Curated annotation (Swiss-Prot):
Signal peptide: none annotated. Catalyzes the GTP-dependent ribosomal translocation step during translation elongation. During this step, the ribosome changes from the pre-translocational (PRE) to the post-translocational (POST) state as the newly formed A-site-bound peptidyl-tRNA and P-site-bound deacylated tRNA move to the P and E sites, respectively. Catalyzes the coordinated movement of the two tRNA molecules, the mRNA and conformational changes in the ribosome. GTP binds at residues 17-24, 88-92, 142-145. Keywords: Cytoplasm, Elongation factor, GTP-binding, Nucleotide-binding, Protein biosynthesis. Belongs to the TRAFAC class translation factor GTPase superfamily. Classic translation factor GTPase family. EF-G/EF-2 subfamily. It comes from Saccharophagus degradans (strain 2-40 / ATCC 43961 / DSM 17024). This is Elongation factor G 1.
Amino acid sequence: MARKTPIVRYRNIGICAHVDAGKTTTTERVLFYTGLSHKIGEVHDGAATMDWMEQEQERGITITSAATTCFWSGMQQQFPQHRINIIDTPGHVDFTIEVERSLRVLDGAVVVLCGSSGVQPQTETVWRQANKYEVPRLVFVNKMDRAGANFRSVVQQLRDRLGANAVPLHMTIGAEDGFEGVIDLIKMKSIHWNEADMGMTFEYGEVPEDLLEECEEMREYAVEAAAEANDDLMEKYLETGELSEDEIKAGLRARTLANEIVPVLGGSAFKNKGVQAVLDAVVEYLPAPTEVKAIEGTLIDGETVDTRVADDDAPFAALAFKIATDPFVGTLTFFRVYSGRLESGTAVYNSVKQKRERVGRMVQMHSNNREEIKEVLAGDIAAAIGLKDVTTGDTLCAESNKIVLERMEFPEPVISVAVEPRTVPDQEKMAVALAKLAQEDPSFRVATDEETGQTIISGMGELHLDIIVDRMRREFGVDANIGKPQVAYRERITRTCEVEGKFVRQSGGRGQYGHVWIRFEPADDNNAEGLVFENEVVGGAVPKEYIPAVEKGISEQMRNGVLAGYPLLGLKATIYDGSFHDVDSNEMAFKIAASIATKNLAAEGGAVLLEPVMKVEVVTPEENMGDVVGDLNRRRGLIQGMEECISGKVVRAEVPLAEMFGYATDLRSATQGRATFTMEFQQYSEAPKNVADEIMARNGR
């Protein structure tokens, strides 16, 4: 099947931002202007098209990333038709994982900021993630009609707080209630959108006198930024002092794609102003799949690095970036095609699980309406129905050309609660529901506490787990009781040690004999996970066939901890000696011997308890500043800094998660509900001795 849209006219973008900056409203407007939704859905009516889960409509926040395809030909129909695949991502810190995996498969991003709040903590997180994946981006300063909105101040914050080379392409006309429209700095014309037809039409006008001088300065800055793209442009600019409109756009595009500048636009999505210009900017300044670095992967030998370029005739390679359970069709696997083509009904190879799978049907999503398609090509984002064993981050490829694309890294959960079904019939349904939800969301884990037999669920924050429990009730009909939230502590050793583990049972008949010497070393990083295991046994002191059992014994004991029953982080273990018995040695004996050696780490390795520390940011009125800082200090917080912002003072601190339960209520009562806070996981740090002793006593150690 031939392509309807050439790949150079594809744009795969994400719309991401801090919670409440107006991402979903912006996306709704995009769908309206591109002709996909005939009635604009409002977030505060609970009718937004992109927020299709019931919880999202109730809470007015976006939880999952809905993927949508739309088409755009420009505000003045000045472009050939471009195909824009949009992923609307959540801004709440507990769902950072959704943002991370969306950015992983996108070519460009639109970061939405609030005109009055400016750069907020989640904006910094999104920015860091976009830097990590080298995603070119542009910024839309939204909500310019809100009290306290200030375009210039937000541009300055982008430079100061994010270190971004922000290049404004708009200047806003008026602000707050007096917000009228924007000035296009490249054309040096004002744009007023028509309110009668919800901004579908607009008029160009002259730049208001009082803004002329400032706009000329800002335009000069943009032209200089464009001229730095290459020698030809710079030469022309130095000779004539001017560049044509097309040259300015070409220069800005080249530098945006190279992540050297960030174009900034302004408007108000709610008031239907500015979103159309953002769509034009997406076409003009963000990359097509062919303009980004070809994705790298490793061949099946696990070492050779290869690339996949965006070409329909190259071998097929795609990345599954999200699994969703749909009430009507079952499991939907969202995937991004990097190279090649795939027809529905054909087989693909999952190179991570090393399994063949058949793709039943494929659909293109418009929020949660779906259109069935027969074929996907390089650059497409689609969802497949009928893939059984695919999980987030798996690579789908042609069996004749196997490759594993870069895996995604998912954060460790920081908070756990026990869940119990209310009735016996709920028991089985709960197991099925939790398994499906864990398959969808890699930052959510399910485990069984071996001592109590309780089911423990873990996630990235209280809201995250609330929503999981809510979804169990709504989507799977499971009622559950929830325990008190528990902090996910960890353990680690602080020094290198050599430990003996010996397990001997020889009292007539077949005995047990396992004996090992293991050198344990701590990882350099407090937050390193897992076990690095090496075998340095020479001369057959421990036969090769027992070595895997030794590794298994260590890793099982690591899961149960050595101090207070919490998993042991970042450990390097090297078996270098031991002994065996011709008759009595077996795998089980060596596994137990290794487990005994690991248990001895509490004393030998100077094991310590680690607690999750959160990065907390509180925005408070000035008069409550003292109370807020005092309260954070009481919670063992380390104040990192304070600064002014439009709505008062911002206090930044690092606080142990254990001290943050119930903080929202305490902060509300201390400031009469005027302060707000956000927190996200920062790192694991050693817990003070008195805290560690208390936890060990509580766990009966």
